Amino acid sequence: MKHSVTVVQDEKENFGTVVKGFVIKLMPAMPKWNGKNLVRKVLIPLASIVLFIGLWHVGAKALYNIEADYKIQKALTDQGQEAADQMAECIASGAISCQPNTLPSPAQVWTSFNTLIADHKAISADKAEFKAKTATLNVKREAEGKAPITYTGRPSFVDQIFTSLKTVFAGFLLALIIAVPVGVIIGLSTTLRSSFNWLIQIFKPVSPVVWLLLVFMIVKTMTKNSDSDSAFIISFISVGLCSMWATLVNTAMGVATVDKDYINVAKVLKLGPIQKVFKVILPSSLPLIFTGLRITLSVAWMVLIAIELLAQSPGLGSFVWEEFQNGAIDSNSKIIVAMFVIGIIGFLLDRIMLTVQSMVSFNKNATA
């Protein structure tokens, strides 16, 4: 009995050690906060943020004044002094109808951000109310074999963010499934590398718009009598085809440049072809493969906006285009909010990939 208790305690200690090691890998070590680190890691970044916001505010104010002067001068030229005076008074009063529509200030962008969050909360409340009202009816419809009644209201800004994330992850997964196996096969053979190099070099620089049109033609034909979401399918396939090339090239290069000593060790151990790939070649190629995957994810996120805009998928691309078309006084500030959200999410996705790379790869210098 005492022996079994000791074994359980040992297992708990081993599990705790594994979890602790995982957390240490996932979270970077905290720096020692001496004066030099405090200045370099905190004060200088904060100063750069303050400087950026200050320059932005000054630039927005200057553009506002230029646009306001233009509107006043135009009123003077077209309608006379009285109209110009009225325009000047209207602009000074802050009335929405006559405000210059130019680069928004940081304060306006922050206000629009809060407006979008409040709008999301209101839409979420409407969804919850709709779900509660239709719950009984949907249970009855499902029992009768009918499709449930779903909420068809407009998506909120936060909903569109999650739609874009779903699309980019589906596209990234497609790129991974295609690029890594094909890259391994091409990398194992000099003949295949020479045979497929021209194909890669031709398709790698193709514009996302062209890929979208090609995918659109194929998907529309194949989903004519289907209830599937063709906009989502078109978007994620286009994203995957646009972004897979960096992973394909890096995987082939990583496989082709595996140290010959590792290959010789595999021969000595008499590993079969499959064992050699999974136990020697792929582990040795991981640094280059993950570099390609990081580039693929970044490219996927960049091309997503243009693809969603054209495919009419209800994501961030659609949000930006609708606000641009809307032309309301706060449309520009909402577009700037979307720009910051896109940039921050792109940065976080890259950090996640870098963290995963450091956990599964022996290359500890990949910290760019």
Regions found by a protein language model. Give the residues of each.
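Transmembrane alpha-helices
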Residues: 273-307, 337
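Periplasmic/extracellular loop-to-transmembrane helix junction in inner-membrane transport proteins
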Residues: 30, 65-172
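Transmembrane-helix boundary motif in ABC transporter permease subunits
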Residues: 170-200
